[in-house]
UniProtKB/Swiss-Prot annotation:
Its EC number is 2.1.1.199. It comes from Caldanaerobacter subterraneus subsp. tengcongensis (strain DSM 15242 / JCM 11007 / NBRC 100824 / MB4) (Thermoanaerobacter tengcongensis). This is Ribosomal RNA small subunit methyltransferase H. InterPro entries: RsmH, SAM-dep_MeTrfase_MraW_recog, SAM-dependent_MTases_sf. The keyword S-adenosyl-L-methionine applies. NCBIfam families: 16S rRNA (cytosine(1402)-N(4))-methyltransferase RsmH. One of its GO terms (molecular function) is rRNA (cytosine-N4-)-methyltransferase activity. The lineage of its organism: Bacteria, Bacillati, Bacillota, Clostridia, Thermoanaerobacterales. Belongs to the methyltransferase superfamily. RsmH family. The gene is rsmH. GO terms for cellular component: cytoplasm. S-adenosyl-L-methionine binds at G33, G34, H35, D52, F78, D99, Q106. Specifically methylates the N4 position of cytidine in position 1402 (C1402) of 16S rRNA. It catalyses: cytidine(1402) in 16S rRNA + S-adenosyl-L-methionine = N(4)-methylcytidine(1402) in 16S rRNA + S-adenosyl-L-homocysteine + H(+).
Length: 308
């Protein structure tokens, strides 16, 4: 299948990266290669390090970007940025981009099991070599663990009922497909609550996907590592798709911009100096036109910071 992925907030992201044609840039979430391609168009002697956990994403992007010789492809998790750069003998970079969440390609590729709209095996792994999948979460987690995941990562108010219904249902046999899970969720959520708002399974599927791929785990640490490897005046641009991710990015940036731990109103004695300047005081949102053209962009937010 061709890797189709509309890059979200493309123009805004590239503009805010302030690309230096001779600089070194990192795309930590290569995906379909849309953002990478725009960065490469602006480089002369510079280079791009393109990272993704998904082997298929890398293969598809290599095809798309085959005319560019200044790309280094790395199959890894962007959280290992320091180790990745160390292995390449690179100390500092001029800009980093992260486009978090699942790509439209992964959603479209039915057998990956990311979508609640199509029947597929319960999988949801971004890295297909990982031994842990959605099947394990749904069939092996205790009711309490399921409730925690669905409440915490899905912000789902019916989490306890959904967890209870999953555990009841699996007594009859393993839950193996996305459509089985969707039916259980529909039964768990009262009909009156299902009439309005998004698809009833949306939040639970998001929660399980985040758990399977550990999407929020160590994200704050990874952001701090990325800021550390930025050169002065280098920028980091992060696109998020739900409030949990956005909160982590916002709070990490705030902490790095104002790390002082002294009581307000007293002179600073802790010696902690600001590391970044936040460029986007409020997140940049997609235009009305972009949302109409690409509904997936509706919940996207872009935050940008510059290394001091």
């Amino acid at each position: 299948m061709e890797y189709v992925h509309k890059s979200v907030l493309l123009k805004e992201t590239i503009e805010h990266l302030n690309i230096n044609p001779e600089g070194i840039y990192v795309d930590g979430t290569l995906g379909g290669g849309g953002h990478s391609e725009e960065i490469l168009k602006r480089l002369t002697t510079g280079k791009l390090i393109a990272i993704d956990r998904d082997e298929e994403a890398i293969l598809a992007a290599k095809e798309r970007l085959k005319d560019y010789k200044n790309v280094i492809y790395i199959k890894d998790n962007f959280k290992n940025i320091k180790e990745i750069l160390r292995n390449l003998g690179i100390e500092k970079v001029d800009g980093i981009l992260l486009d978090l969440g699942v790509s439209s390609y992964q959603l479209e590729e039915v057998e990956r099991g990311f979508s609640y709209m199509k029947d597929a095996p319960l999988d949801m792994r971004m890295d297909k070599t990982s031994p842990f999948s959605a099947y394990d979460v749904v069939n092996r987690y205790s009711e309490k663990e399921l409730e925690r995941v669905i409440r915490e990562y899905g912000e789902e108010k019916w989490a306890s009922r959904i967890a209870k219904f999953i555990v009841e249902e699996r007594k009859k046999g393993d839950i193996k497909t996305t459509s089985q899970l969707v039916e259980i969720i529909k039964k768990a959520i009262p009909a009156s609550a299902r009439r309005t708002g998004p698809h009833p399974a949306k939040r639970t599927f998001q929660a399980i996907r985040i758990e399977v791929n550990e999407e929020l785990k160590d994200l704050d640490r990874a952001l701090e590592d990325m800021v550390e490897v930025l050169r002065g005046k280098g920028r980091i641009a992060v696109i998020t798709f739900h409030s949990l991710e956005d909160r982590i990015v916002k709070n990490t940036f705030k902490k790095l911009e104002n790390p002082c731990t002294c009581p307000p109103g007293l002179p600073c004695t802790c010696g902690k100096q600001p590391v970044i300047k936040i460029i986007t005081k409020k997140p940049i949102l997609p235009s009305k036109e972009e949302v109409e053209e690409n509904p997936r962009s509706r919940s996207a937010k872009l935050r940008v910071a510059e290394k001091l």
